[in-house]
Amino acid sequence: MAEPRQEFDVMEDHAQGDYTLQDHEGDMEPGLKESPLQTPADDGSEEPGSETSDAKSTPTAEAEEAGIGDTSNLEDQAAGHVTQARMVSKGKDGTGPDDKKAKGADGKPGTKIATPRGAAPPGQKGQANATRIPAKTTPTPKTSPGTGESGKSGDRSGYSSPGSPGTPGSRSRTPSLPTPPTREPKKVAVVRTPPKSPSAAKSRLQAAPGPMPDLKNVKSKIGSTENLKHQPGGGKVQIINKKLDLSNVQSKCGSKDNIKHVPGGGSVQIVYKPVDLSKVTSKCGSLGNIHHKPGGGQVEVKSEKLDFKDRVQSKIGSLDNITHVPGGGNKKIETHKLTFRENAKAKTDHGAEIVYKSPVVSGDTSPRHLSNVSSTGSIDMVDSPQLATLADEVSASLAKQGL
């Protein structure tokens, strides 16, 4: 069964060592309302019932805590803060009965908190710190007063675990084992009051303003007041405006020698006289032909036809040979055909006579003898000298051919 969430505020008074537990909701189970706040005795001894309540938690509380907690990590983190909250110093003086007020009485700084789950009723404030001890925490023996004092001034539980509702931050007698740094439960905002310790009061007394310094005997820096009453003399300078006396001024050397000189250029007069052209004569011979008229305009160009037949004569001797016919045209070019058979002769003289009939048609149709072959086989070339040369050429060519 889920429990209603409870929020607690833990306020520490460093001057007196008291802790105040405040229940914001006031909803608790009936079985957990009676959890008295036990304080150590004057002689440093404790009541037997308080030791057992501090060392252990009820089985029902542990069982319910194991079933109600959200996550194991959040419970482990809350367990570390609970064990640290149980540390209480034993060297303080004075003990008293259970206190139902918001703060403990003066002279009872060492209060020990019981650890059943739940909180005090709404009417009881500061009666007990209702905390849940996880199953992992084990009770440890009490420590010396010095260690308790250091534990009280050391850690402070400023938040409650969201996984374990109704578990406020409180102090324990024994130091808790170091928890892993990765386990960070969700923090709940807790209002904390500033520590009220004698040291803070002393610091306030020391911060009080001291007596004001005497500023009448303060001396100035070296040489800073020597010219304190000095006034600048620039304002006493007077600028006097005097008129210049130009009566005795003399000119520069030679500047007044020609002061009355008048430039003579202005006396020149430009006289305009008309030119008399009546006596002007012309240039040499310019008036001799003044009435001359050019005769070019009187020349007439006549067009006459030329009669070449009547008047034209031939060049010298050009008509003497007008009927001459050149004689080159009467020459004839003869063509002779070479025949090897007709002009050939046998290598051996067999005594036969070669007769050749020319193809040219002529009046003499009788055959003629080209050559007279002697008994010795020689040819008579007296009749035709051209044929003799041809015969020699033919014979030479035949000899080469092997005929």
UniProtKB/Swiss-Prot annotation:
One Pfam family in the UniProt entry: Tubulin-binding
Topology relative to the membrane: Peripheral membrane protein
Organism: Capra hircus
Location relative to the cell: Cytoplasm, Cytosol; Cell membrane; Cytoplasm, Cytoskeleton; Cell projection, Axon
Bias-annotated ranges (Polar residues): 50-60, 363-378
Composition bias type Basic and acidic residues, residue spans: 1-32, 90-106
Record-listed N6-methyllysine modification sites: 221
Residue numbers of N-acetylalanine PTMs: 2
Source taxonomy: Eukaryota, Metazoa, Chordata, Craniata, Vertebrata
Free-text domain note: The tau/MAP repeat binds to tubulin. Type I isoforms contain 3 repeats while type II isoforms contain 4 repeats.
Residues that bear Phosphotyrosine: 19, 159, 356
Gene Ontology MF annotations: microtubule binding
Disulfide bonds: 253-284
Protein name: Microtubule-associated protein tau
Residue positions, PTM N6,N6-dimethyllysine: 125, 273
Residues the record lists as Phosphoserine modifications: 35, 50, 153, 157, 160-161, 164, 176, 197, 199, 224, 247, 251, 255, 267, 286, 314, 318, 358, 362, 366, 371, 378, 384
Tissue specificity statement from the Swiss-Prot or TrEMBL entry: Expressed in neurons.
